[in-house]
Amino acid sequence: MSKLDLTKYGILNATEIIHNPSYEFLFEEETKAGLEGFEKGQLTELGAVNVMTGVYTGRSPKDKFFVMDDTTKNTIWWTSDEYKNDNKPVTPEAWKSIKKLAVEQLSGKRLFVVDTFCGANESSRLKIRFIMEVAWQAHFVKNMFIRPTEEELANYGEPDFVVMTASKAKVENYKELGLNSETAVVFNLTEKVQVILNTWYGGEMKKGMFSYMNYLLPLRGMASMHCSANTSMDEKETAIFFGLSGTGKTTLSTDPKRKLIGDDEHGWDKDGIFNFEGGCYAKVINLSRENEPDIYNAIRRNALLENVTVDAAGKIDFGDKSVTENTRVSYPIYHIENIVKPVSKAGHAKKVIFLSADAFGVLPPVSILTPEQTKYYFLSGFTAKLAGTERGITEPTPTFSACFGAAFLSLHPTKYAEELVKKMEMVGATAYLVNTGWNGTGKRISIKDTRGIIDAILDGSIDKAPTKAIPFFDFKVPTALPGVDPNILDPRDTYADAAEWTTKAKDLAERFIKNFVKFTGNDAGKALVAAGPKL
């Protein structure tokens, strides 16, 4: 048994502490006989284990809270009546009760403790310790965070932040504590502790630490970004891909012709781009070996599937969304062949790509943005929310999520826009808005065409292509690109009647204008209105 002392966190009488277990040990633990309910993992034909997470098959943003105290009162971007977000306050008194529930659930149990790093740069990385009673949850964080070397573990010392996952505990008295339900995902930034109660969804542990990095890094003059990143084989040409869940971040950055830095969370400092994570968390609904070979091949022993349909013999049906559209796999980043080694970081990004899945069929498949448009569309963060990444959403609905990640922003959105644009201006980077959604055919733009567009951005051929302007939005769009169907580049050409595009375009332009009002409270925001759509 580990000599680790958990009493300093209030956890008493642990019957056994398994500290930094190996993958082999976790595999035995999560598939052993006698496990019940959501603790149980099932071995699949691909060698990966599948687990189910119950009613929570996505994050639960309504249950996310920060303790409001002297640390956070004037720094957190709190939710308000006029501009709602997920940063809801909870009192220090309520926190005591919430933490007590987690501590009592974990006390007297056999526990897993996993020590990780968040952030690939030694100068800014955090030591995060996860404590849980469920083997597959330990496996999940081992996949998703940076795994310290033996030597780094020997000198690990005290963590910078502690996460207690107590999925079996419920908050019965949630109303009197000012919470939303029996489920709670609560951060205390003074104590540097996160508590997760009554949800089994793995993504809460991953995204919790993203919210914390999003709090710390911009205050230290770094950009903190909800994006994927890759670089050329010689590691000289870096690109970053912003986008909300389901817009193609993982798919498009996982490119056999380039090296992956990471698929979801990155920082940008004076030296370049660095990953926060040590793994990938890919959506696997309708996954096929043909369309996404790298992700498909990453699903093997030590990968962990979530909420995928698997029959008694272990056969996987990736097309079945009866449990959720938000089926996932986590795997250590080295399951992808082309990655930046040994540390997931590279130089400055010259190409910045905003991915938007437009359900209206209005946006061009690619637009070259001016610096002012870059700020405007970054703050707008438009996409159509795609099925199932949050509870209760199954049809595409338009959404504006500041900085392509409002759910994870702990500070005001303009802070992230400032840091990003500062870094872009420093290196002369260009931004492109890429629509991975629908057009006038009623079908989604093909992965083949989107990949052709990304190739043209990365190899620079888009910057030499002839262009035209698109009305209302004043987007500069190429009229021809190698390997891309020329008939889709102007979205009007995909409609049987271009007047239908005009009607839809006016509607979408109006939504952009209305949404942007919330950013016009200061001069910087007011100045950007001119870069947006005009009716």
Swiss-Prot record:
Residues that bind Mn(2+): 207, 226, 264
The EC number on file is 4.1.1.49
What the entry lists under SUPFAM superfamilies is as follows:
PEP carboxykinase N-terminal domain, PEP carboxykinase-like
Return one GO MF term.
ATP binding
Q: Which InterPro entries match?
A: PEP_carboxykinase_ATP, PEP_carboxykinase_C, PEP_carboxykinase_N, PEPCK_ATP_CS
Which pathway does this chain act in?
Answer: Carbohydrate biosynthesis; gluconeogenesis
Cofactor note text: Binds 1 Mn(2+) ion per subunit.
Which terms does the UniProt entry file under GO BP?
Answer: gluconeogenesis
Q: Which reaction does it catalyse?
A: oxaloacetate + ATP = phosphoenolpyruvate + ADP + CO2
Localization, UniProt: Cytoplasm
In this chain, substrate is annotated as bound at 59, 201, 207, 328
Q: What is its main location?
A: cytoplasm
Q: What is this protein called?
A: Phosphoenolpyruvate carboxykinase (ATP)
